[in-house]
Every structure is written in C-alpha cells, then in structure tokens.
C-alpha cells in the first residue's frame, strides 16, 4: 500500500489550504459580480431570445 514517506509540515499544509481558500473566494466573488450584472441588466455578454410571436400579431 502506498504511503507518504514523510509527514507534511503544518506550514506546507496551511499554505496549500490558503491557496485553495483564496481561489474559492475569488471564484465566489466573480460569480456574485456576474449575478449582480445580470440582475441589473448591465451585462453585455449574454444574448436573450426575444419573443417575436407577440410582435407579428
């Protein structure tokens, strides 16, 4: 069975966790910003289909 040769230090463990948490926080911030822009109608990167059936009548 494969096992690590040496125990990972607490500093290395904390450094990795800090990196993961920083990346998660950045993604959460981007998602929140994107959601806000969609809700306020300021986003230009989304194309919404318009109902043309109502206009033709």
From Swiss-Prot:
Gene3D superfamilies in the cross-refs: Single helix bin
Q: Which GO terms describe its cellular component?
A: large ribosomal subunit
Residue ranges of the region described as Disordered: 1-24
Which cysteines does the record link by disulfide bonds?
A: none
Work out whether the entry's keyword set contains Ribonucleoprotein: yes
Q: Which InterPro entries match?
A: Ribosomal_bL32 (IPR002677), Ribosomal_bL32_plant/cyanobact (IPR044958), Ribosomal_zn-bd (IPR011332)
According to the UniProt entry, its GO molecular function terms are:
structural constituent of ribosome
Q: Where is the sequence biased in composition, kind Basic residues?
A: 1-20
Q: Does the keyword DNA-binding apply?
A: no
Sorted keywords for this record are: Ribonucleoprotein, Ribosomal protein
Family classification: Belongs to the bacterial ribosomal protein bL32 family.
Q: What PANTHER family would the database entry show? A: 50S RIBOSOMAL PROTEIN L32, CHLOROPLASTIC, LARGE RIBOSOMAL SUBUNIT PROTEIN BL32C
Protein name as it appears in the record: Large ribosomal subunit protein bL32
Q: Which organism is it from?
A: Gloeothece citriformis (strain PCC 7424)
């Amino acid at each position: 069975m494969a096992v690590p040769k040496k125990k990972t230090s607490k500093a290395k463990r904390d450094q990795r966790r800090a990196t993961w948490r920083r990346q998660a926080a950045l993604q959460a911030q981007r998602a929140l910003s994107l959601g806000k822009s969609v809700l306020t109608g300021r986003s230009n990167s989304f194309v919404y289909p318009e109902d043309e059936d109502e206009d033709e009548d």
